[in-house]
């Protein structure tokens, strides 16, 4: 009697399958949105450099003000305008998404590289969020678009890699991941809610003047 072998751990369950189907589209479309936002931000940055009196199109009021953010040291965290990093990163993300949609099955090292890149993006975005809320005191609408796509890209890439066994994990970690996969959209909603509360709290004095 032939023993039945345990199936390899992959995203074949209903929840894992959803992650696997969503990720390529998220990379392609979310990356494209991020690329457009980063490009628009770079254009505004160049206009500000050419004309210090230029008012960016994304400067709406004292709080929603790209002009304020673009002229801070944080806007060039690594010695070059942050949008350049965004253009490079999102170009890679879009390419990966298109490759996956075409049916390619990249090797593990490829996925680990994507994981490292999205992790860097997520950490950098949260540093920028902190700087915007508590140091600069202004929000850049184009930057917020980048925030809104970077975190989901990191989140779904991480869930997919853990589910597929590409990242080191223990049985306990995998059980936790199974729960997170089941509530993948809920986690993102909680993150968005927490960010909304933080923004409301940071600029509460200004918001109340609009009532």
Q: Over which residues does each language-model region extend?
A:
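Secretory/periplasmic and organellar redox-cofactor proteins
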Residues: 1-211
